[in-house]
Regions:
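Low-complexity, glycine/serine/proline-rich disordered segments
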Residues: 1-54, 239, 252-261
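Short linear motifs at secondary-structure transitions and domain/linker junctions
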Residues: 30, 92-105, 142-148, 157-159
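Generic detector of ordered secondary-structure context
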Residues: 27-33, 61, 119, 173
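Short linear motifs in intrinsically disordered/low-complexity regions
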Residues: 3, 10-12, 33-34, 44, ...
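Generic structural motif
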Residues: 3-5, 84-87, 152-154
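Long beta-strand-rich cores associated with HINT superfamily self-processing modules
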Residues: 110-259
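Charge-rich, low-complexity segments
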Residues: 43-119, 135, 139, 194, ...
């Protein structure tokens, strides 16, 4: 029996992707003036259909890797301390993957297939620790992950001027599955999920983040994040990072002005 994903996204209503990768359309799917399937009579959604096909493959691969990864995360939390939160969202949905793949392909000037290969958080976890134990627990967990055979890359966003605070760890398991693990304090997690979340969602949708509005949104996130107390003991841990850069959207604007898009 086919595994089917039917989309509720406005651009994909009425489209079902089967296990074979075929796209099936319902008669309710909007068409343009020439009878092509599209969004409200607009452009043909070929790129988004291709993104949906790749998203399904990414999701199925992630689904196979997730049980073992989740067991490992529970073992690490039990062994080293820290609390796993947000486990209901450990698998990114097909619809979310579709949007991310399509958006990344467009803004980074890469193929849809390449954008899909670069997805690093189809399986993702968050561990929350007490500030006094945060650094020691993050270091212990990452070293334990290395000893278990994971490829580990640590990005330390606890930097002055960052619009986001936390430690993000990019993992690759023995099968090649990419996994993300974020380390937060209760304070930084609340900032990410509540205070800064609506601002970031607005910011990331901007075509040009250098506009006064974009700069204002980023300044709000930086100011909010500056209020968070930095846990001790993080010096030298991971690669220092300042916020989640969206500067490539400036390249998109330039490319459009030159007639490339």
């Amino acid at each position: 029996m086919d595994s089917r994903f039917t989309y509720t996204d406005d651009d994909l209503v009425g489209i079902t992707i089967t296990r074979s990768g075929a796209a099936k359309y319902s008669e309710s799917q909007p068409r343009d003036e020439r009878g092509r399937f599209g969004s409200g009579g607009g452009d043909f959604t070929t790129s988004k259909l291709e993104a949906a096909y790749h998203a399904k493959a990414v999701y199925e691969k992630a689904s196979h890797a997730e049980p073992a990864a989740t067991r490992a995360m529970h073992e690490l939390a039990d062994k080293h301390g820290g609390k796993l939160v947000g486990l209901d969202y450990r698998l990114k949905s097909v619809e979310s993957l579709t949007r991310k793949i399509a958006d990344d392909a467009k803004k980074d000037f890469k193929s849809v297939a390449e954008a899909a290969r670069n997805i690093s958080d189809s399986v993702r976890y968050t561990m929350v620790s007490d500030p006094k134990e945060y650094a020691a627990q993050a270091r212990a967990v990452t070293e334990d992950l290395r000893s278990r055979g994971f490829d580990v890359t640590v990005k330390n966003y606890w930097q002055e001027g960052s619009n986001y605070k936390g430690v993000n760890v990019a993992l690759v398991d023995h099968s090649g599955q990419k996994i993300e693990l974020q380390f937060h304090t209760a304070e930084s997690f609340a900032m990410k999920e509540s205070t800064n979340h609506p601002i970031y969602e607005e910011y990331r949708k901007l075509d040009d983040t250098s506009t006064p509005h974009g700069q204002e949104l980023n300044a709000q996130m930086v100011a909010n994040s500056a209020s968070i107390s930095t846990p001790p003991g993080l010096t030298g841990f991971g690669v220092p990072k300042i916020g989640k850069s969206l500067d490539n959207k400036l390249q998109v604007r330039y490319y459009r002005e030159e007639g490339g898009l």
